[in-house]
Amino acid sequence: MGIKGLFKLLREKIKEEEKEGLKRKELGIPDDDTKIKYKPLTVYRFRRLKGITVAIDASLAIYRMVYGKLKSGPSLVNREGKLTSHLRGIFYNVLTFLQNDIIPIYVFDGKAPDIKSKTIEKRKLRKDRFKLTSEDIKEVQILLDLMGIPYIIAPGEADVICSWLCARHDSNGKRYVKGVCTEDSDMLPLGAPYMFKDMLGLNNLNKNIIIVKLKDVLGFLGLTMNEFIDLCVLLGCDYCDNIKGIGPKNAYKLIVEYRTLDKVLEFLHKSNKITSTKTNKTISNNSDDSDNSDDSDNEIKDSNKIDISNDLEDSEENSDDSDSSDEASDSTENEICMLKAAEYFRTALKEIDESKTFVLTDDQLKLRQYQHDELMDFMCVKHNFDPRSIKNGIDRLNSYNKSMNITRPNKKVYHKIIEPKGVTIPSLSDDINFIDSDTDSDTDSDKENNESEKFESKNSRSKTNLIKRNSRS
């Protein structure tokens, strides 16, 4: 899910700044250099990122592959009826990364933190959601091993390890990865310096992606890292709900005014503008309680007071005592979650730094040689993919291995070959079905030639008659 409304807020602030810039230009006022130098959202052509290493949230990538296929057509399944769309998607996505000389490091979720338990329960209740099983994950890991692609199984959330890889340096003083390839903005309050949006599922080097630079986001919004974390929590994230009636613009105004989440919550309580996270009975009818809302009716009236409501409804007249009690309980519970979420964002990477069990190996960070026969068997025999397409993909993989000089061995057994004789790749001629009347006899050939001559002669006469008619006119 990520941070609710964060990118909406950034885009709207960018538009506002662009309008202000045009006004300053018309009035002959110099541009505000402090704003110009910050570019929180930058559009890049994918091929420009050549030669880097990226961390990828594996679970998110799998979901994107499955739902992407659902939008374009029926899902792919193997002979046993098991879904395989994600395997095909990961296979070709890896090839696109390698084609651009990019090393992908996939990171899989471990045990979810207790703070995320409510979010997980909500997701389980969604009937239309693709359920990612342990078998699905294992199959993707086998595919990556056979292709020689590194991956990490996180001790906790993949988000944290992805952000840690991006923020920390190896023994040579170089960051493990340049950025995190994800659509989940949780990476930013966790401390990932770079986030790459719209890169999952990419299969074209000429496509555009969006690079989100944390340093520029902070500078553009005029916030410290701690203030930005509090803003993200106030907006709502995977670990807590947002406060109903307070959308992106008002959340930003509150953080700018009060600077900390504690003081914002204190202000809201004193102003009687917060009692529940499930209803907005104490919030204005004009409040911005969704990511698509407009904050035009909720402005800062002066430097000492923020007005986020106009016509407050009387909660006592519109609810009974039990409802009020439930609302207060909901509010208190969510506020506790918000404070825990802020602390989690601040300390998650430090816990990895101090962990004595989290150790990285070369196999988790570097490319290895691929296993040709096993990969063909895994994809074509076990999962029923077209042999010719997979063979073409493996040929591409071989060329990228050579161009990237991948020499690290990969001899461990990840998949036991099902068809020892190898996968049969049908020739093009096998795909041609001749009908009974098709023969190679000379008489039939002569007949076809005669028919062809008659057709050409008829066309010639038609053209001649047309020329004569045109000349008469």
Curated annotation (Swiss-Prot):
EC identifiers of the protein: 3.1.-.-
One example GO MF annotation: 5'-flap endonuclease activity
Compositional bias annotation for Basic and acidic residues: 444-459
Cofactor note (record): Binds 2 magnesium ions per subunit. They probably participate in the reaction catalyzed by the enzyme. May bind an additional third magnesium ion after substrate binding.
Skewed-composition ranges (Low complexity): 278-287
Required cofactor(s): Mg(2+)
UniProt-listed InterPro entries: 5-3_exonuclease, 5-3_exonuclease_C_sf, HhH2, PIN-like_dom_sf, XPG-I_dom, XPG/Rad2, XPG_DNA_repair_N
PANTHER family recorded: FLAP ENDONUCLEASE 1 (PTHR11081:SF9), FLAP ENDONUCLEASE FAMILY MEMBER (PTHR11081)
Family the UniProt entry places it in: Belongs to the XPG/RAD2 endonuclease family. FEN1 subfamily.
Protein name: Putative endonuclease L386
